């Protein structure tokens, strides 16, 4: 994981869904050999180890994540079911990722996200907005999966054009870095540039798919999408 490698810290990752509750996060009793035994959740593990707690896709959560309020204030948490107070060890940090910054998705691009409680959001003091990587950085990412530098350059230029067109309102969809990785991996399988792109953009509607293909034609004259 990039966060772990960059910080050289242990990272405890929790994938948040609408079903995530206090039992999933803080912990609860489990049946072990006929007895009920308390089992710490990932949040308590991170607290006690002084690790980085990563709440991934936190805007998919319900109001059940409000059980984290005191932890986000740096005060630790009282485990009322077993009568124990857990203080955060030195270095404990909470990071959350969210596609909508906790404001929900009005355009429907991130269906399932929710508007999070304002008091909950206020407990995150710093927000970083992560744009797409520059073409140079994106090329380095793709180079981990593909050796064709020429193809990588064309893909990065293509994605950059699509994103600028999207921002200008010319198209309704965008190509992510993850989608580019899918494409170069498909290229390693098929050995065909056009087929790799087509198979990986077929999840979009036909109009968007054709628009993407036409935009790629502008950066790579050697590729044809004709059947």
Q: Model segments located where?
A:
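C-terminal regulatory/interaction module of P-loop NTP-utilizing enzymes
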Residues: 1-227
């Amino acid at each position: 994981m990039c966060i772990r490698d960059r910080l050289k810290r242990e990272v405890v990752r929790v994938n948040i869904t609408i079903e995530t509750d206090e039992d999933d996060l803080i912990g609860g009793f489990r049946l072990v050999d006929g007895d009920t035994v308390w089992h710490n959740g990932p949040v308590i593990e991170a607290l006690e180890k002084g690790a980085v707690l990563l709440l991934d896709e936190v805007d998919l959560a319900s109001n059940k994540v409000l059980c984290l309020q005191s932890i986000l204030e740096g005060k630790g948490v009282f485990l009322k079911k077993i009568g124990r107070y857990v203080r955060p060890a030195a270095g404990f940090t909470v990071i959350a990722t969210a596609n909508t910054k906790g404001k929900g998705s009005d355009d429907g691009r991130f269906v399932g996200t929710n508007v999070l409680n304002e008091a909950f959001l206020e407990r995150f003091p710093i927000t970083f907005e992560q744009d797409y990587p520059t073409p140079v950085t994106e090329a380095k990412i793709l180079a981990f999966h593909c050796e064709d530098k020429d193809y990588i350059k064309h893909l990065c230029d293509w994605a950059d054009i699509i994103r600028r067109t999207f921002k200008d309102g010319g198209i309704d969809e965008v190509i992510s870095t993850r989608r580019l990785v899918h494409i170069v991996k498909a290229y390693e399988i098929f050995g065909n540039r056009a087929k790799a792109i087509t198979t990986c953009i077929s999840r979009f509607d036909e109009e968007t798919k054709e628009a993407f293909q036409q935009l790629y034609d502008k950066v790579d004259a050697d590729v044809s999408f004709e059947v």
